[in-house]
A protein has these predicted regions:
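Terminal helix-to-tail segments of small alpha-helical proteins
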Residues: 1-91
Length: 91
């Protein structure tokens, strides 16, 4: 299993802000999409990975874009996450 440099998570209320945010995040920096998932009660999130600076830049761009069309619930960047965290994602 490859070691992740950093992961970024953006959670939104509704699918349209998720798509807008994920699109902007992927275009803003050299990051890879790990997954998106329905959290429940209309909340959805996407997870990206890459180096720490790229993930931070991508999350910032994603939050800005998503907030233009809907509500951003939370955002998170984790540098050097533990290996076991990778097992929680649907790859």
């Amino acid at each position: 299993m490859a070691k992740m440099n950093a992961i970024g998570i953006v959670e939104t209320k509704g699918f349209a802000p998720l798509i807008q945010g994920a699109d902007a995040a992927i275009k803003a920096a050299s990051v890879d999409m790990v997954e998106w998932r329905q959290v429940g009660s209309g909340y959805v999130s996407f997870v990206i990975e890459g180096d720490v600076a790229a993930v931070r830049s991508a999350v910032d761009a994603g939050v800005e874009a998503a907030s233009r069309v809907g509500e951003v619930i939370s955002e998170l960047v984790i540098p050097r996450p533990i290996d076991e965290l990778d097992q929680t994602f649907d790859r």
